[in-house]
């Protein structure tokens, strides 16, 4: 799977979509499914004999393309028009398809209540039908939407139903997404043990699928869950695997985030030398991609770790670099923090004259 096939949505969920799906990478530790270009031909025939049906199909195809381009408002308009035409000709299966896709689009746009409404309408049309794939999609949208609305009991209810169907269909990719979503719900509830159980199942499947992008995300999720449980050795084990894959995929931003987590986990274990190693790697990556915020954070982390080792001179060097960068970014808060750390490091060295050079 190529990097271009991965989505950059920042939502912390994994929606399933119609009807052929594949994994894409997203920000903040998530995996998502998207249409591939070939799937549209399976949804709609290229030509229809009935004018209304032909126009409805055209609008549905157009809505799909607009959603893929991130044009959610125009996608909603096209899909609503398509739905009206399918309703006029009484085509219930196509209405269910459009409603399910409207659930996805409104979910993607952050309108979770609308996503729930569309998905519930879709399910009501699917009663007593054998279209398990579409039911699976609608259940996924419902579960993810309820999670964002912090209704975790309903989120679990719908996602467990979704997972059951993925298992019936033996759809490994959708099963992976459902497991990952359930893990995220339990993480939001603070039940990290249950979240880890789902994520561990996700890891087995993603490795079976030989999907490196998906594996990177699942490893990161597992590392985060173990970190939240203060089990830093296990967190480090998963993060280290994750960063190797992220580097091989040239996913520099993800590698940068995981290196930060690795440094923090090592610091929590009082392994300051190893923490410095990871912070330095992150600093190098931040400079390569000209990410000033990550660079500023890395410099601060390095200073703190050097202080922990008693190397105040090196800590001062990092803090001074951080101070210059914070000023260039016009980041008053980071500037004040850097000044405070500089004064403290100078006092620790007994260099009171130098400490007085730093205002604040």
PLM features per residue range, with description:
Residues 48-50, 69, 88-91, 125-131, ...:
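Short coil/turn linkers that connect adjacent helices within long alpha-helical scaffolds
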Residues 1-111, 123-124, 353, 357-360:
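Flexible inter-repeat linkers and adjacent short helices
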Residues 57-68, 94-108, 133-150, 159, ...:
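Conserved alpha-helical positions within TPR/SEL1-like repeat arrays
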Residues 316-330, 336-360:
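TPR/TPR-like (Sel1-like) alpha-helical repeat modules
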Residues 78, 248-251, 268, 273, ...:
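Long, mixed-charge, low-complexity intrinsically disordered regions
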């Amino acid at each position: 799977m190529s990097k271009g096939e991965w989505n950059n949505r920042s939502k912390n969920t994994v929606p399933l979509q119609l009807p052929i799906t594949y994994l894409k990478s997203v920000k903040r530790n998530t995996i998502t499914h998207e249409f591939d270009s070939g799937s549209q031909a399976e949804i709609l025939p290229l030509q229809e004999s009935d004018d209304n049906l032909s126009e409805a199909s055209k609008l549905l195809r157009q809505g799909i393309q607009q959603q893929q381009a991130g044009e959610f408002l125009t996608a909603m308009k096209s899909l609503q028009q398509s739905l009206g035409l399918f309703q006029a000709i009484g085509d219930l299966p196509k209405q269910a398809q459009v409603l399910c896709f409207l659930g996805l689009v409104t979910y993607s746009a952050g309108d979770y209540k609308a996503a729930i409404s569309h998905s519930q309408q879709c399910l009501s049309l699917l009663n007593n039908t054998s279209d398990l794939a579409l039911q699976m999609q609608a259940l996924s949208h419902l579960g993810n939407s309820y999670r964002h609305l912090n209704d975790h009991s309903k989120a679990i209810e719908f996602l467990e139903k979704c997972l059951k169907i993925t298992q019936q269909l033996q759809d490994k990719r959708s099963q992976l997404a459902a497991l990952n979503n359930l893990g995220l719900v339990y993480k939001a509830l603070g039940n990290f043990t249950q979240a880890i159980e789902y994520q561990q199942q996700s890891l087995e499947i993603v490795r079976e699928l030989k999907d490196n992008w998906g594996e990177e995300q699942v490893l990161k999720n597992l590392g985060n869950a173990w970190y939240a449980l203060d089990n830093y050795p296990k967190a480090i084990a998963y993060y280290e695997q994750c960063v190797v894959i992220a580097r091989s995929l040239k996913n520099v931003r993800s590698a940068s985030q995981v290196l930060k987590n690795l440094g923090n986990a090592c610091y929590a274990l009082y392994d300051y030398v190893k923490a410095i190693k990871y912070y330095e790697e992150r600093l190098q990556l931040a400079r390569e991609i000209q990410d000033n915020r990550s660079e500023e954070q890395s410099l601060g982390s390095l200073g703190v770790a050097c202080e922990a080792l008693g190397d105040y001179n090196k800590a001062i060097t990092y803090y001074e670099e951080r101070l210059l960068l914070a000023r260039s970014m016009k980041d008053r808060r980071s500037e004040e923090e850097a000044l405070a750390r500089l004064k403290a490091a100078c006092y620790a060295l007994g260099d009171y004259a130098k400490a007085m050079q730093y205002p604040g």
